[in-house]
Amino acid sequence: MALPPEQLSAVRQPLERELAAAREVAARAGLGQTEPKILKLAHHTTVHLSPTPIAARICGASIGSDAKLRRELQVARHLASRGAPTVRPASTISAGPYFENGCAITLWEFVSGRPPETAADTMRAAQALQRVHTALQGAPRPLPSFTVAFDSCERILSNPPQSELLDSSDRVFLQTINTELREQLSRRELDLRPLHGDAHLGNVLLTNPGAVWMDLDDVCTGPLEWDVACLPGEAWAEFPGIYRELVQLLNALRRVCVTVWCWADSDRSSETREAAIDHLQQLKTRFASQEST
């Protein structure tokens, strides 16, 4: 579903540059004149190149390296060949990656769907994720470790200009709990396997055939519990054999990462700024309650 126009006024200025780059890439790819309709504003921007059946995924060229984007497309093609419920790279034209006006862009088949809204939707998403995990076996290697997420957080926290709106005391709080949680994780033996890497419900669409997972740029190797930790607790039962204590630990680490990333990107939109504030408050509440027990 495209974002309503009234939400676009709060979006940071570079969005217009991204949309212009998407139009240029669409023309270069042979799609003719298109009108990008915003589907998702996150750390990447996803647009439908209307009226074509193609979507574009856009990020800053400094974020999306050629090698990383090519790996994402390669993994996506592997998943498509296995019949996995995932988005597919454009096949009638070159999927890219393209680099235009400081933006890195890949092209995908457009999927019309809606976000999960009910407990039943969550279960369907979890079951589809199981199929993705099965199809990821034999995915092109090497894949990065899931710990690159933690490294990214540490770099942002140690470089205040990357998250300048974050209060210094809050920065110390996040650095402290990030260090403590990573130390706890280092004491555990982990069974590693290929994962989606960012399996929260914002990265899945419900379509008529079923749930479809997207945003495959964080595919990695890690414990199954890393993907499960992205899901609501009621979905954990769909993954028998997981260690719930490990899921809870990784859920806490993931919340730290999401909080840091939101603060680093808090000028992207009012939604991102609100999410940054909300995630930080949830972490403070969570760790305050742990200290009092």
Please provide the spans of the model-predicted regions.
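A glycine-centered beta->alpha junction motif in the catalytic cores
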Residues: G60-A61, A104-T118, C153-L165, V256-E274
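ATP-binding glycine-rich phosphate-binding loop
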Residues: A29-S50
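Catalytic-loop of the protein kinase fold
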Residues: P194-H196, L201
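A conserved alpha-helical element in kinase catalytic cores
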Residues: E16-L19, I58-N101, E117-V132
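Active-site Asp-x-Gly
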Residues: R193-P194, L206-N251
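Juxta-kinase regulatory segment immediately upstream of eukaryotic protein kinase catalytic domains
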Residues: M1-Q33
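A cross-family kinase active-site recognition segment
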Residues: S112-D170, L192
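Helix-rich C-terminal or lid/interface subdomains of diverse kinases
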Residues: G241-T293
